[in-house]
Amino acid sequence: MFRYIEKEARDSITAALEKLGIKVPPEIKLEEPPNPQLGDLASTVSFELAGKLRRAPIEITADIMSVIETPEIFETIESKGPYINFFVDYGRFSSRLLESIQDDYGSHPPRDERVILEHTSANPNGPLHIGHIRNAIIGDSLARILRMAGYDVETQYYVNDMGRQIAMIVWGLLNLDGDLEDYPGDKMDHRVGKLYFEVNQRLKENPGIRDEVDELIRKYEAGENEELFRKVVEYCLSGMEETMKRLHVHHDRFVWEGQFVRDGTVDRVIESLRKTGYTGENDVLYLDLEEFGLEKELVLTRSDGTSLYSTRDIAYHLQKSEEGDVIIDVLGSDHKLAAEQVGIAVELLGGKRPEVIFYEFITLPEGSMSTRRGVFISVDELMDEAHSRALHEVKKRRDLPDDVADDIAESIGNGAIRYYIARLSPEKHIVFRWDDALSFERGCASIQYAHARACKLLEKASFTGEEDIEDGWKPEGDERELVRLLARFPVVVEESALARRVHPVAQYAQDLANTFNSFYRSTPVIGSDFEGARLRLVDSVRKTLRNALNLLGIHAPETM
């Protein structure tokens, strides 16, 4: 509906310019005035025409205003200096908007574009930790937004089964007493992490172990010990997938790094790069990128001839280039150089350079799970802590059966983590503060509470969805602001998808929840003269909040 009123405004200006014999510019720009008293939309078309017509913008606006016709969706069109301001007829517009809001509100028609979005892709050498969580949340939320915007999206997890870390774990299984089941931990990824830590300690004591690990890597590339390597990786991934499922993070496909060595793709990549004329060789084969503005070369092989992560990454991106129209990677800001190097190499071989979303890191304040004898904080621990803190808040507020309180706490705890991370642009560093994350006055809990409050009000009113919108209903104040916000939701989805950003959806959800809570306190619904219209408005807010939270991977509870 917001795009509809934009179209009506542009069409009215176009018709006016044609009447005046003025050539219509390629784009008639519209903006939302900062003050609603200045209208719902404003056009700066007179500024755009001033140079070509050699006239003052205010004179051009006066001419346009003398012939412009007001579309029925607008109450009036006024000039404010050189601006042309459009005021929506909220009596007419609000009814149309509420009639249009269905369960899938915010969804866009399918686009003929396939997106391959890789995210998380943590090495399977232990549990996911706080350093991985922002990647997973940005990637999963963006995939949801892109799908709602009409894109065909496949999310991928790139499994590093050929890295040194996995070879170290395999060395541990071959040389230390016991199997993975013998290590402490409730989940397999934690047991793998314990073994990896132990091997690291042995390596510090005996650096000669490194040669044995290198030999394992060579043998694995040649096809030996495949079963053991796969066992280690699958064990660890099973635990990591449990964590991601609890956090509502989903991957459509797991792509194993080793496949590109096994099927000869890496060899073909190396041979193709040699033919570009940009490679050099000393102890290792490398790609000279100085001509592309990078002083640091990209090393393609080890001195013993085995492939490196970078080479296999190029092979993987070439596969993604064949499978998708748009390639998106989510990476930490410390990967900027490597991503630039791989992007150049992929383009040299005719592939698509990926769009990369870089993010800064997340930390916990000192004393808040941040230092546990120097060991990283796992995502499992973070979620357990969030659940525990949320359960405490829930029990303070209501006397509920344990199982109900537990479910609500899980919803609030996971929502707190996902929302707190999604709400900021990826370029900003995050310090995770529990009091802010779990606040019922701000943050995700307040949004979930607004949804639950809407559900309760509709239940109390025995709402059916068939209620009539009364004649004469013309929203004002918070009611009107709710209508304005509801109309914008599809635009927020579209713009977030195009910008490849998640935080505008998070901010929108907070704005909608805040406005609804204000409306709830100030505006009577049940028993009012406009009960039908207001119940329909509340139901539209419920649907939109639910859909916005779903885009962020957050459950919208019906009770809190």
Swiss-Prot record:
One of its GO terms (biological process) is arginyl-tRNA aminoacylation. It comes from the Archaea. Keywords: Aminoacyl-tRNA synthetase, ATP-binding, Cytoplasm, Ligase, Nucleotide-binding, Protein biosynthesis. GO terms for molecular function: arginine-tRNA ligase activity; ATP binding. It catalyses: tRNA(Arg) + L-arginine + ATP = L-arginyl-tRNA(Arg) + AMP + diphosphate. The lineage of its organism: Archaea, Methanobacteriati, Methanobacteriota, Methanomada group, Methanobacteria. It is found in: Cytoplasm. This is Arginine--tRNA ligase. Its EC number is 6.1.1.19. One of its GO terms (cellular component) is cytoplasm. InterPro entries: aa-tRNA-synth_I_CS (IPR001412), Arg-tRNA-ligase (IPR001278), Arg-tRNA-synth_N (IPR005148), Arg-tRNA-synth_N_sf (IPR036695), ArgRS_core (IPR035684), DALR_anticod-bd (IPR008909), Rossmann-like_a/b/a_fold (IPR014729), tRNAsynth_Ia_anticodon-bd (IPR009080). Belongs to the class-I aminoacyl-tRNA synthetase family. It is an enzyme of class 6 (ligase). Pfam families: Arg_tRNA_synt_N (PF03485), DALR_1 (PF05746), tRNA-synt_1d (PF00750). A motif ('HIGH' region) lies at residues 122-132.
